A protein has these predicted regions:
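Short acidic, Gly/Ser-rich segments with clustered Asp/Glu that frequently serve as metal-coordination loops
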Residues: 42-51, 60-62
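Walker B beta-strand of ABC/ABC-like P-loop ATPase nucleotide-binding domains
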Residues: 39
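Metal-dependent phosphoesterase core characteristic of DEDDh/y 3'-5' exonuclease domains
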Residues: 11, 15-17, 28-30, 34-36, ...
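A solvent-exposed, charged loop/short amphipathic helix patch at secondary-structure junctions
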Residues: 56-58
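A short acidic, glycine-rich active-site loop
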Residues: 61-65, 112-114
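Metal-dependent phosphoesterase signature
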Residues: 104-126
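Extended, intrinsically disordered, low-complexity regulatory regions
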Residues: 1-23, 28, 116
């Protein structure tokens, strides 16, 4: 039996912290109980040249030359926060190098990505199949970084970024800030 605790609003969506039979906490989306969502994350060859870029375009694509996709991982969760399925793919660095400093962070060497990876368009196609037609919510930590990485690779490979227009992107970093770092909320809890 689940015991409900602590209803919170994160990015305008109501969530409740619940516990499963083993007393492990998980989030329940109380507004959209039929929703399942996907958390995704890229590992990259580095960071963008300019950190303040809010959206990638053809005009500023060169800002992302130092931030190329090396791997893409994702996990599908139910509305009750239960893991349903995972997706992991290495991406071949066909026209860039994976630096040693990047390898130190994520453990993916240039050689490994070349030998075990696949071209980005193939990985993207499989990722879209993994998402499926019913899921519309994608979640990431600092999601603007992952979204820019995704869109920059799509632009480089001639894939229309408009196919992402129907998705809602949620940022766990922003959710955390809203819940725990807001001075107004901190003041109200004192």
């Amino acid at each position: 039996m689940n015991t409900l605790q602590n209803a919170i609003s994160i990015s305008g969506i109501m969530w409740t912290v619940a516990e499963d039979k083993d007393k492990k906490p998980y989030l329940v989306n109380t507004q959209m109980t039929c929703l399942n969502y996907i958390a995704f994350d890229f590992e990259t060859s580095g960071l963008p040249k300019k950190r303040q870029v809010s959206k990638v375009t053809r005009e500023n694509l060169s800002n992302f030359d130092t931030c190329r996709a090396v791997s893409l991982s994702a996990a599908r969760f139910s509305s009750r926060g239960r893991l349903i399925k995972t997706f992991d793919a290495l991406i071949q660095p066909l026209d860039f190098e994976v630096s040693q400093s990047s390898t130190t962070i994520h453990g993916i060497s240039h050689e490994k990505a070349m030998s075990e990876g696949r071209p980005f368009p193939d990985v993207f196609r499989d990722f879209m199949e993994f998402i499926g037609p019913r899921t519309k919510t994608l979640i990431g930590h600092n999601v603007i970084f992952d979204l820019n990485c995704l869109q920059s690779e799509m632009l480089r490979h001639g894939l229309p970024i408009e196919q992402l227009d129907d998705f809602v992107f949620r940022c766990t970093m922003e959710m955390y800030r809203e819940r725990f770092m807001s001075p107004i909320k901190l003041h109200l809890t004192l």
